[in-house]
């Protein structure tokens, strides 16, 4: 089926398969495309096509990811599948593949394993909001009680990390049997996708979120005032809107947008993705700087201390050659600027090796507009040594 035929009229959702190595994530991905292809909603992909995922170099880090797309009756999906565990860690922390929901694949023959736990924790930390469970390899388990036991274990594990374990849909199936065309098991794939359709909500569009624009540059126009330029990250801004200037200062300043300009043309409004200049009333040139954000009043606050999930680049990826310890003071690059911060490691962690991922507490020397889920990179003298995502705000 030609790519051109895909209808873009359906709502779009990004999902991915997560779970322990060899529990069947890639086989399930292949099975979904193969089963949906029969209804004309996908291009069937074999296991080998997905498993030979190309390595992508996202900002200097090598991540192997397979991207497939398919559709159900109600939605269009982009689906990511990573062959290696390290690929997931990098993918989820850098946001290279945003997920609106995940399909957690657990082998019924083995039950939850270490990476099952790690992927659930990562999903929690990086803000994957919804998880649906596919208990795989059920054709290999004859004992109904054993299946129920594994299901209970998975539900408990999800609850432990703050997901609604009791309410999450769990589908029992066999990806391999479905891939081989056995009708009973194909039906389980259809059931899985029906649950994904129903349980994972359509994400809010970027334009519907509260306005936010990182300030990239500032200049003054004689007789008109101060202009802040940048790319609108989310939401919509209209002439006459009251916005706040947030970050790098003790207090947020409030101002009115008196003009919006894009490619030297004046606009009434701008939206997510637009590169604009915003003319700000009563703001002096020195009152605003790169690294601050313009945002809808009250929508976001500046914070200096937070917990983050961090992935440290290995030496081969251009990162550090040596470990770092508590009280390490690198720069944290948020959106458009570097801010120095100091690191506290969790109890029992003496040091962090290149290539590790770790949860840490970071205290910046100046507050920055951040929220749970805000991405950042860690730099030393302009060289990136790690990536992170804000997990929880401390103060």
From Swiss-Prot:
Location of region: G5? 174-176
Main localization (coarse): cytoplasm
Q: Where in the cell is it found?
A: Cytoplasm
Q: What is its EC number?
A: 3.6.5.3
User: Residue ranges of region G2?
Assistant: 60-64
Which family is this protein grouped under? Answer: Belongs to the TRAFAC class translation factor GTPase superfamily. Classic translation factor GTPase family. EF-Tu/EF-1A subfamily.
Q: What class of enzyme is it?
A: hydrolase
Q: Which organism is it from?
A: Bacillus cereus (strain AH187)
The GO terms this record gives for MF are:
GTP binding; GTPase activity; translation elongation factor activity
Any idea which UniProt keywords this protein has? Answer: Cytoplasm, Elongation factor, GTP-binding, Hydrolase, Magnesium, Metal-binding, Nucleotide-binding, Protein biosynthesis
| Annotated region (G3), positions in chain | 81-84
Designated gene of the protein: tuf
Q: What function does this protein fulfil? A: GTP hydrolase that promotes the GTP-dependent binding of aminoacyl-tRNA to the A-site of ribosomes during protein biosynthesis.
Q: Taxonomically, which superkingdom?
A: Bacteria
Residues noted as binding Mg(2+) in the record, renumbered to the chain: 26
Locate the residues binding GTP: 19-26, 81-85, 136-139
Q: Name one GO cellular component term.
A: cytosol
The protein's name: Elongation factor Tu
Pfam families per record: GTP_EFTU, GTP_EFTU_D2, GTP_EFTU_D3
Q: Cite the residue spans of the region called G4.
A: 136-139
Alphabetical list of InterPro entries matching this protein: EF-Tu_GTP-bd, EF-Tu_GTPase, EFTu-like_2, EFTU_2, G_TR_CS, P-loop_NTPase, Small_GTP-bd, T_Tr_GTP-bd_dom
**Region G1, residue ranges:** 19-26
